[in-house]
């Protein structure tokens, strides 16, 4: 173990030197200079985190100012900034770890995430908020294991798919029993733990990450098509079997039928977008965040962005996310060219995670999807979510960093 940590430390020093500026290729004989990390991707991540910090303060100031327990209108801003600092520090540590280590430890990471999900359900350990048992209190912060499970599924699904590629791409029965069934069993276990909290939104994200990774790994087409049908039927069954979820669907179909009951959140979200028009009412000038729109600084942050910055602000945020997802898939394609199959799948799975969760959150805010308890990645208030997002993007940056060095003759 000591030797492993020493190896990571030495590699970390190389990373630190490379981040200070351009370096020369191995030959060093008149070849062009190059940078060893993806600067545009890093700046897009910084831009999204900065937008999130500003908008969390804007959306939460009324809540913090009215709550005597917080003693400050900067309460949520300070907590979000501290969470962001911890997340960036964790991201830096993750960036220094070679991706082969993540692949080697993927099953253990996945198992640890399952244990944390199980601990949430234990009375006295799991913390109940708004009727859901999703958090573990650590004293200085509340840890939400479902957010860490998303990262665990990314590395585990990428590792599993890269190891089982021969079976996944083989005959139907071989692909089914040796490729699909083990992964399906793991996701069903995770789904049972998440639905027990309950956290249907996190389960939807985890299931899509796993399914999409199997698809990218070349799973038999008939199995994947059957999986889509089974997934759709299961989703409908979960909604119909829960009166709470049915109420959300009914409120989603016509929020104006009961604007003070089932459709309250969605109706006020739509009002916020309507007030924003093209360029918004200005930073800090939102009316809906003044106790009209619940969860304005978490699940419905995009509605506040729409009200204060209008269509232009929404288009900017969506454009940044779209570029980030495209870049993740591009890094995955570059990894595949280098025959780094785990890294390729992990990069694209991170892109799927960010893109799919953004799609659900923005769709809910716009009334295109039923209300879910999912935050907007990198922007919404929430320490565990920011931590998991920054760690995932650090892995993405590390994959790209290793690709660049390999293409120029370095070993990683």
From Swiss-Prot:
- Topology within the bilayer: Multi-pass membrane protein
Q: Which residues lie on this side of the membrane: Periplasmic?
A: 62-73, 130-134, 197-199, 244-303, 370-375
MF terms in GO: lipid-linked peptidoglycan transporter activity; peptidoglycan glycosyltransferase activity
Residue ranges, Cytoplasmic compartment?
1-40, 95-108, 156-175, 221-222, 325-348, 397-412
Report disulfide bridges, numbered on this chain.
Answer: none
Question: Enzyme group, top EC level?
Answer: transferase
Enumerate the catalysed reactions. Answer: [GlcNAc-(1->4)-Mur2Ac(oyl-L-Ala-gamma-D-Glu-L-Lys-D-Ala-D-Ala)](n)-di-trans,octa-cis-undecaprenyl diphosphate + beta-D-GlcNAc-(1->4)-Mur2Ac(oyl-L-Ala-gamma-D-Glu-L-Lys-D-Ala-D-Ala)-di-trans,octa-cis-undecaprenyl diphosphate = [GlcNAc-(1->4)-Mur2Ac(oyl-L-Ala-gamma-D-Glu-L-Lys-D-Ala-D-Ala)](n+1)-di-trans,octa-cis-undecaprenyl diphosphate + di-trans,octa-cis-undecaprenyl diphosphate + H(+)
Q: In which pathway does it act?
A: Cell wall biogenesis; peptidoglycan biosynthesis
Q: Quote the EC number.
A: 2.4.99.28
GO CC terms on record?
cell division site; plasma membrane
Keyword annotations: Cell cycle, Cell division, Cell inner membrane, Cell membrane, Cell shape, Cell wall biogenesis/degradation, Glycosyltransferase, Membrane, Peptidoglycan synthesis, Transferase, Transmembrane, Transmembrane helix
Does the keyword Cell membrane belong to this entry? yes
Give any Pfam family that matches. Answer: FTSW_RODA_SPOVE
Role summary: Peptidoglycan polymerase that is essential for cell division.
* Assigned protein family: Belongs to the SEDS family. FtsW subfamily.
The name under which this protein is listed is: Probable peptidoglycan glycosyltransferase FtsW
- The scientific name of the source species is Laribacter hongkongensis (strain HLHK9)
The record lists the lineage as: Bacteria, Pseudomonadati, Pseudomonadota, Betaproteobacteria, Neisseriales
């Amino acid at each position: 173990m000591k030797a492993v940590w020493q190896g990571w430390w030495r590699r970390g020093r190389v990373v630190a030197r490379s981040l200070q500026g351009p370096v020369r290729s191995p030959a060093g004989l008149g070849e062009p200079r190059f940078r060893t990390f993806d600067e545009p991707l890093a700046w897009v991540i910084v831009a999204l985190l900065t937008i999130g910090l500003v908008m969390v303060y804007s959306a939460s100031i009324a809540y913090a100012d009215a709550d005597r327990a917080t003693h400050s209108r900067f309460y949520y801003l300070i907590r979000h900034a501290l969470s962001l600092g911890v997340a960036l520090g964790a991201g830096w540590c993750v960036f220094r770890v070679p991706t082969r280590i993540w692949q080697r430890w993927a099953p253990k990471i996945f198992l640890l995430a399952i244990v944390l999900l199980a601990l949430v359900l234990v009375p006295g350990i799991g913390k109940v908020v708004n009727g859901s048992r999703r958090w573990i209190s650590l004293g200085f912060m509340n840890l939400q294991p479902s957010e860490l499970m998303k990262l665990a599924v990314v590395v585990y699904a990428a590792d599993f798919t890269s190891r089982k590629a021969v079976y996944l791409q083989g005959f139907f029965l071989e692909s089914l029993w040796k490729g699909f069934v083990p992964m399906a069993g793991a996701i069903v276990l995770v789904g049972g733990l998440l639905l027990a909290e309950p956290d249907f939104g996190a389960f939807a994200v985890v299931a899509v990450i796993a399914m999409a990774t199997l698809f990218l790994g070349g799973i038999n087409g008939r199995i994947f098509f059957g999986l889509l049908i089974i997934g759709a039927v299961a989703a409908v069954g979960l909604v119909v079997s829960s009166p709470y979820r049915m109420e959300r669907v009914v409120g989603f179909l016509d929020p104006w039928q009961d604007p003070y009951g089932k459709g309250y959140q969605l109706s006020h979200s739509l009002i916020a977008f309507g007030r924003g028009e093209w360029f918004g009412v200005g930073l800090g000038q939102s009316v809906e965040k003044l106790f009209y729109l619940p969860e304005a600084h978490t699940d419905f942050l995009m509605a506040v962005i729409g009200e204060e910055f209008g269509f232009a602000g929404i288009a900017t945020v969506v454009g940044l996310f779209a570029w980030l997802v495209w870049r993740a898939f591009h890094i995955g394609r570059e990894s595949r060219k280098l025959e780094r199959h785990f890294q390729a799948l992990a990069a694209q799975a991170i892109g799927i995670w960010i893109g799919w969760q953004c799609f659900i959150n923005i769709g809910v805010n716009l009334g295109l999807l039923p209300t879910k308890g999912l935050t907007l990645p990198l922007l919404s208030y929430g320490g565990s979510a920011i931590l998991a997002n920054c760690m995932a993007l650090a892995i993405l940056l590390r994959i790209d960093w290793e690709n660049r060095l390999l293409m120029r003759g370095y070993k990683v």
